[in-house]
Amino acid sequence: MDTEDDPLLQDVWLEEEQEEEEATGETFLGAQKPGPQPGAGGQCCWRHWPLASRPPASGFWSTLGWAFTNPCCAGLVLFLGCSIPMALSAFMFLYYPPLDIDISYNAFEIRNHEASQRFDALTLALKSQFGSWGRNRRDLADFTSETLQRLISEQLQQLHLGNRSRQASRAPRVIPAASLGGPGPYRDTSAAQKPTANRSGRLRRETPPLEDLAANQSEDPRNQRLSKNGRYQPSIPPHAAVAANQSRARRGASRWDYSRAYVSANTQTHAHWRIELIFLARGDAERNIFTSERLVTIHEIERKIMDHPGFREFCWKPHEVLKDLPLGSYSYCSPPSSLMTYFFPTERGGKIYYDGMGQDLADIRGSLELAMTHPEFYWYVDEGLSADNLKSSLLRSEILFGAPLPNYYSVDDRWEEQRAKFQSFVVTYVAMLAKQSTSKVQVLYGGTDLFDYEVRRTFNNDMLLAFISSSCIAALVYILTSCSVFLSFFGIASIGLSCLVALFLYHVVFGIQYLGILNGVAAFVIVGIGVDDVFVFINTYRQATHLEDPQLRMIHTVQTAGKATFFTSLTTAAAYAANVFSQIPAVHDFGLFMSLIVSCCWLAVLVTMPAALGLWSLYLAPLESSCQTSCHQNCSRKTSLHFPGDVFAAPEQVGGSPAQGPIPYLDDDIPLLEVEEEPVSLELGDVSLVSVSPEGLQPASNTGSRGHLIVQLQELLHHWVLWSAVKSRWVIVGLFVSILILSLVFASRLRPASRAPLLFRPDTNIQVLLDLKYNLSAEGISCITCSGLFQEKPHSLQNNIRTSLEKKRRGSGVPWASRPEATLQDFPGTVYISKVKSQGHPAVYRLSLNASLPAPWQAVSPGDGEVPSFQVYRAPFGNFTKKLTACMSTVGLLQAASPSRKWMLTTLACDAKRGWKFDFSFYVATKEQQHTRKLYFAQSHKPPFHGRVCMAPPGCLLSSSPDGPTKGFFFVPSEKVPKARLSATFGFNPCVNTGCGKPAVRPLVDTGAMVFVVFGIIGVNRTRQVDNHVIGDPGSVVYDSSFDLFKEIGHLCHLCKAIAANSELVKPGGAQCLPSGYSISSFLQMLHPECKELPEPNLLPGQLSHGAVGVREGRVQWISMAFESTTYKGKSSFQTYSDYLRWESFLQQQLQALPEGSVLRRGFQTCEHWKQIFMEIVGVQSALCGLVLSLLICVAAVAVFTTHILLLLPVLLSILGIVCLVVTIMYWSGWEMGAVEAISLSILVGSSVDYCVHLVEGYLLAGENLPPHQAEDARTQRQWRTLEAVRHVGVAIVSSALTTVIATVPLFFCIIAPFAKFGKIVALNTGVSILYTLTVSTALLGIMAPSSFTRTRTSFLKALGAVLLAGALGLGACLVLLQSGYKIPLPAGASL
């Protein structure tokens, strides 16, 4: 779809830094380990180092450390790191087409799947034949059917006349007169009714030779064609120069075009655009739209649409409306195509016009009886309505707009300009229509342009939440970086720059021109993911206070943090990249874009953050430290909790220097700590909380320099892990095993989706409209002439009996059931009130439409709130639509002291169980109107429970209950104003005498999936297509050159009958084997006996058959037969897949029964719905394959990173527990496994492994500096290393988890459903991951981790060899399975 939205994320790629990354990775493995320096004390992280004046030592790492700590070099790195991405993005925006937002369903189609290729082949064949393709194809060119008739005539002449000359054989190419009248009943009736029209049509049907038609198949030389009911139906002859634009015009055209539709003087005569309206009944249990209150509301809404500013400049103005005089005030604009044309007719000059412009509601039942005599009526209502059940839960309407617009010569004259004008106009309806829903009627609005506008607006509004997410994360980063503005700025900036790099790669390098709607998730997720790496770098740098030399400290930070973030970014990027193998373009693009962003984010942080940390430590750290120190001295108190001694350790310079030269650098892992502790006895598995500081170290006097919040968080984590990894580690492992078993049980119960996927929030206008499209009758048919304006002629008001022959031709329907006519008063009535007052008893009031006063009733005198009488309407009139019922009862009255009857008013039906019977009813207003007065009514809560009407509440205090059905107020016309003159259409019943005739039979209106059986087409050729995205060259059709229609005509007719007879697959009357027009079946039965009595489809008048043939160069090239399937389009893809298999197996059985050499054996069945179901089926399958692939990548990466099986095992167990628990929570939440859930699961493994890997990295670093007194006991070593690992990385991973959750929380409030669900899954997974890392992973490390293992180059090579060996064994196993015939599923939905 076209769009003008700017891209939300813009990234570029630093190609020059790839070599640096590779060099960094190689040096990771090749560097050597330094030895500890005796007597070296810890260095305060806030110390201001002097500038490095000496040149760097030889070696890559020394040069790198010097560059990042030299202010000039660090500043240059920051400048280049910011300027290069911005320069690349500027180059992209200036010299490449702008990125668009792809909101089309095409982005989710699997173009290489068999179902898609089949349907695309048919679509391309239809486009090449007719110029457009769509379910509505109202302007399907009749020249094809005429040409087919001519070919059949030639075949018949060759069969019966033998050798005739070529000139004689070409003579029948002028359509025979028999084809004009035809044997069909419609043709005879039309000819009888409109002889003039037939003569006119006969003159226009003379056509040029067949060669001319074949040369330009998209042109129709006829000026008009006669429709089945005698109306003229002009074709649309496009000009060759504007064929592309004209094809769009033809797609929206109907058979009700007019002879001068393309003459420049006839502005807006072509119905080209539309707004779809659906009115849903709500607010009561009955849900019937045909009530007076709801119909009046709908009529008011349609009038507001016509009164909207600018409507007359864009409305549809067909020539038919010129005969409707009341439409003159609207410049003869066509009213909405709606049943309101029957319910609100107008009267002018003694004639009734069914145009919906009247002010008064006609008789509802009589109007429905009149409308139901037309098959077109069923287009407006749901499938439950019938002659015996005049109720519908919804009502459809169409607002039509015409082209060409004023000041344009034709539709093709500056078409894009006309389209832009209409789009800017039509979106002004959104604000108005969004406010029209009431408590009784819900208004849904749609149409192509409005739908696109709604989707774009929804997407943009959801993207605004990303700015809220980024702002919250920026504030949190500021806090967690000890309120360092400098580090916070460059931390967030590095993420933004990575987005520019990734966007540059995505758009320029990979050549993708569109951002899919799923890519919007990146705006939320990447900030949370990218901040993880930022925290690791900052935390690692601050932890390395034991390194005095700033260069060594920077080298340690780059190596340690770079390695840890590399593996975590690798696993996360691999999890997203697993979706690249999906054949669904939207999922493929989402996986590619996210993997690029994660990779570029790691690279940007690797380059930017060391330089920022170098400048910060030289110049900004002392300033921030002094500010925070003064603030904390005044505002904070010291904590009473103990903390590991070296956290607060400040160096005390003894002898003037804490260090004697640089520490020898020997390996890539710098010791984390230089702490010597005295031996402490451990009892019951406890580890001493207080550690003895080495000599020369004392607790710092000010904790504010480290940030009070971070100190408290680190202290809390220390106590937490002391409990989980030492004291209660076996309890945690037991709970973990129990939860894992239960999770496996519940996760196995998660079922595939049972309904179509939600794209938007369920209560939104867009989603409700999409849901209804699965259930609506003829959701793809534009019935622009189904209203009473076109179906009914103006007729005299004095004669309500319809005598039109057009109505009598509707036979075979069920006659209306005999019923007494309900005679409603056509004028306002008066309700008279009288009363009986007995001593000692309350007054009882009588309500009557009769002014007489039988004894003992007495007239009510005005005053004291009494109301002698009031005016009412006996039928809905204007805003007087609230119905009140007067109920009468004799129960509970004493005959001696009271009258024999009592009355009450209610808004509901009379309660027969309590003795109340219906007396009469009337209509009032619920809001104050002009010239009205307000009255109150109530029912006594004491015997005899009678009712009363009065002027004010003090006189109606019969009940203290709140307003309800028997108590409240209403407005009635004021008696001082002259009575309004009711129009002649008020309560008008067109069927008041003998009725309107039989109701029409419900036609076939496309409620199921339309399946096409195609012959003569082999497939589609896309070899020349560059498949970067769904938008591009669709390819070309590959035809079957050996296909001969007349040779296979008998088999085709047999297949048509066989498929139509299968009631399990095809609906009754759903077979459309032939194209529309001119009784082709009467010719076919002469060619072969099998072609006699072909099934006839039951279509709407004007609805064209979906069957089609392709004619080229004087021969039939292909044919497609259409069948309305019993498949319900609202089912889930997994349920519908069984219907697809039934169709496929049945057709193959029929084709295999054909003769061996028949070309029909290459036929196939296809359906647009099959494309849709395979989107989700293959999407889920590819996502699950991606889950397995990402799991394998993560296992391999973690194995190489940890280099020990006992370190790999805790990580794998944690990942398994995390994924199973998340899936279990999804099951408990009532979710099902759809495409969104499967895609989310595929990235869970990569995001779950991050925190565990960081913890294992801390465990390995702690082993590099194991205290001597801990080296004796293996259990003590494991526990100490686990505690040190949490102390090292705990704050970083908790901060990362917190930012990730905050980044995804705004996704919860998105209207786009995949966004919201994706955000919930990511937030849930992040929460479970950090919880399992701090509990299960620490407990498992404290139990099974190797106590004295340290990572070496040898262990790395062994782990790498084991991974390669395992990969080779897995590949060999796959080959063995393939040789044995086992099929291995692939992400593309196929199998090996």
Swiss-Prot record:
One of its GO terms (biological process) is cholesterol metabolic process. Residues 190-199 have a biased composition (Polar residues). Induction: Up-regulated by thyroid hormone T3. Residues 457-615 form the SSD domain. One of its GO terms (cellular component) is cytoplasm. The chain crosses the membrane at residues 74-94, 463-483, 485-505, 509-529, 574-594, 596-616, 730-750, 1183-1203, 1205-1225, 1292-1312, 1321-1341, 1359-1379. It is a multi-pass membrane protein. Gene3D superfamilies: Multidrug efflux transporter AcrB transmembrane domain (1.20.1640.10). InterPro entries: DISP3, DUF7023, HMGCR/SNAP/NPC1-like_SSD, MMPL_dom, SSD. Residues 95-462, 506-508, 595, 751-1182, 1226-1291, 1342-1358 are lumenal. Residues 1-73, 484, 530-573, 617-729, 1204, 1313-1320, 1380-1392 are cytoplasmic. Residues 16-40, 162-248 are annotated as: Disordered. Expressed in brain and testis. Glycans are attached at N163, N1021. The keyword NAD does not apply. The SSD (sterol-sensing) domain is necessary for the increase in cellular cholesterol uptake. Plays a role in neuronal proliferation and differentiation. Plays a role in the accumulation of cellular cholesterol. Involved in intracellular lipid droplet formation. May contribute to cholesterol homeostasis in neuronal cells. This is Protein dispatched homolog 3. It comes from Homo sapiens (Human). The gene is DISP3.
